[in-house]
């Protein structure tokens, strides 16, 4: 079957007279069939100058083969791993990493010289020392076209699937402008603002037969490099590389040489291309998934994808090696094409059949989408994602964490029967029975999805706008197949209290004795210096106030000008708990923000105004609590070393409760029922001392 062959050089060091084994796609270097004298006599060299460029929008094996003038049989040899490419031909190995990524390639091609050996067979003596042994070579190089190729491969970042086609079209339009730039190097590509923005985000990979001082990595550098390429190519063959090679059967010069018995058909070539292209797409999909931000939150899911990629990579190595072996056997005549077809049939019956592989990816992609939908619901809340159970335990044991609410994904695991089948098949390809399909998991259950999303919404409602230093919100993945999809765990001081938490349960205010129950509503307050009376001195980050000498002050309309009072920084509109330490003459409570600032009348004096609800502490006298309609309740406390005071405000119930605090024990002594019910947020307020009487005091917010 041996006949003339025309093939692409692909960066291989072809020379006139070199031997070539077309069965193994192997160049036999270091020996020429013809001696130097014969080559000088019959070799000719002819200038053949040309240059061209083209834009390549496809990343398929077939399109790359067409661009590089690779004939079908050589293309399959490359895919089977028989051909090691160099120079610009390394472009063949550069495939897109992600499926959702746009790629456009600019090719620049020049030819310089055509060399050929023109002696007719029978007119020359050949050197037989290296070809006397059988199975060395089938062909000899008789002509070479020299030149150079350059490929600028531009990639976009990962994009949404819906934007892929639009980005692709815009990239093509931008890159088509590069060849229009002046070759002298003084020109620049004329781009619109939108095109400039697009070009600035493109990466560039260069594959070429040109010796560059530095390789371009950006669009601008690619433009500059493209301008210089014509200067880097001379007119002699020594300035180029073998672009195209002509080979004739060795039998024309040596009758005992081996033959290329047969080659594979075009139909089989297309079959190989199709199979490998499908597998490349699968790899890109897996890469897309591994780069997904959602996957990075789930180490077990990430591990599962990496296991899949490893199995895939090991299979591809084995599959390509087998293709290589079958190709050589067919070309030697030891087998026919049915051997290759049988390889493909065996693959269809294996766990690595493309339908099962794609099905597994679809299931995994759906799992990622389900997890992302829950994460998106939670995302706007203040939470911390913990990547492992050990990290979760560490966070729960943090001394600052009194309460913790954790949204737990229960079904995310690295266990997968299909991946086990892939691994077992690679170990013993003949021991596994019929093809194995992935198991459709929980991701197909709408019920599970609804449960997970409902719990995500509940978690968000608990965590949204929560500004509580004692309550931490976590998101974790803990395998528990007994719980459908997700659960909300409630921990108190690192101990799991409720595995199916919905909302905190609060006792009647007078029955609350455990301080930790109210710390769920802890509210970290600071004093507002813009409202502070000039005789109050704030310190410790506006957490402490003491009475002192009256100072000069500005005319800020928010500042109290008569009574020694100061408001806290935030409005209270839900349930809130805070604590204070006090000493001396002090009044604490809540009021509307509209309380008078400069008025002399009683309505600007907390403890006596109708829109303030307070507790007054007077040393040696005790405590007075003022509620609705200026009614006052008196509590006389013998222990003057009053412990910290706890205040619990329930806006919905319209109450303000007071507790003596001792460690984690609360002693309730009064609750004000605010009537009429509150109509707007209230603010914590403090009065210290009295400038008209020798009353002084100190307050610290805890």
UniProtKB/Swiss-Prot annotation:
Glycans are attached at residues 93, 100, 201, 287, 311, 530. Residues 266-385 are annotated as: Structural FAT domain. This heterodimer induces potent hemolytic activities (when tested on rabbit erythrocytes, EC(50)=25-56 ng/mL) due to its ability to form pores in the cell membrane. The pore may be composed of 10 alpha/beta heterodimers. The toxin shows cardiovascular effects that include a vasorelaxant action that may involve the L-arginine-nitric oxid synthase pathway. In addition, it displays edema-inducing activities, increases vascular permeability. It also shows myotoxic activities and interferes irreversibly with neuromuscular function. Keywords: Cytolysis, Disulfide bond, Glycoprotein, Hemolysis, Hemostasis impairing toxin, Myotoxin, Neurotoxin, Platelet aggregation activating toxin, Secreted, Toxin. Intrachain disulfide bonds may be present in the heterodimer. Residues 505-702 form the B30.2/SPRY domain. Pfam families: MACPF_SNTX, PRY, Stonustoxin_helical, Thioredoxin_11. GO terms for cellular component: extracellular region. The lineage of its organism: Eukaryota, Metazoa, Chordata, Craniata, Vertebrata. InterPro entries: B30.2/SPRY (IPR001870), B30.2/SPRY_sf (IPR043136), ConA-like_dom_sf (IPR013320), Cytolytic_pore-forming_toxin (IPR052090), PRY (IPR006574), SNTX_MACPF/CDC-like_dom (IPR056072), Stonustoxin-like_helical (IPR048997), Thioredoxin_11 (IPR040581). Residues 386-513 are annotated as: Thioredoxin (THX) domain. It is found in: Secreted. Residues 2-265 are annotated as: Structural MACPF/CDC pore-forming domain. The keyword Secreted applies. GO terms for molecular function: toxin activity. The keyword Disulfide bond applies. The first domain (residues 2-265) is structurally homologous to the membrane attack complex-ferforin/cholesterol-dependent cytolysin (MACPF/CDC) pore-forming domain. It makes numerous contacts with the FAT domain and comprise essentially the core pore-forming machinery. This is Cytolytic toxin-alpha. GO terms for biological process: killing of cells of another organism. Heterodimer of alpha and beta subunits; non-covalently linked. Also associates into tetramers or even higher aggregates. Belongs to the SNTX/VTX toxin family. Expressed by the venom gland.
